[in-house]
Regions:
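Charged docking surfaces used in two-component/phosphorelay signaling
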Residues: 15-23
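As written
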Residues: 60, 90-98
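C-terminal output helix
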Residues: 102-115, 119
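Receiver (REC) domain active-site loop signature in two-component systems and cognate sites
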Residues: 55
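Active-site residues of response regulator receiver
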Residues: 52
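Helix N-cap/capping motif at the beta->alpha junctions
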Residues: 30-39, 60
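Short amphipathic alpha-helix used as the core "switch/output" element in two-component signaling
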Residues: 39, 61-72
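Hydrophobic/aromatic residues positioned on beta-strands within the core alpha/beta folds
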Residues: 77-79
Length: 122
């Protein structure tokens, strides 16, 4: 079972994403901030990270850089309510960019595709 780490400072979104991804057969872990997410990556490496950009403390862009510095083989999906970040070249290092929505279809499909692609490359 593939393990997905969800890093988002909004509890209701963490729960929504966790519920939908588990429904699709993924194991999930959740982190309320980037620091906690990075700890999980060190101690219990996930197969994929769903990462919010705007969070208190360390933002998702800095966390993305730290994830890539540690292990650039873990796919990262940037997930944000602000589509303007898509133009920020710092976000281009992510494997995918999804704009937050109450409809999780795009996020779930993106996770599936990236994990499938990652399995083929491994």
């Amino acid at each position: 079972m593939k393990k997905v780490l969800i890093v988002d400072d909004e509890p209701h979104l963490r729960l929504l994403y966790e519920t939908e991804l588990r429904r699709e057969g993924f194991e999930t872990m959740t982190a309320a901030n980037a620091e906690q997410g990075l700890e999980y990556i060190e101690t219990m490496p996930p197969d994929l990270v769903v990462l919010d950009i705007r969070m208190a403390g360390m933002d998702g862009i800095e966390a993305l850089q730290r994830i890539l510095d540690r292990d650039n083989t873990i796919p990262v999906v940037l997930n944000t309510a602000y589509s303007s970040y898509k133009e920020n070249f710092m976000t281009w290092a992510a494997d995918a960019y999804v704009t937050k929505s109450s409809d999780t279809t795009e996020l779930v499909e993106t996770v599936k595709e990236l994990l499938q692609d990652h399995a083929v490359q491994a």
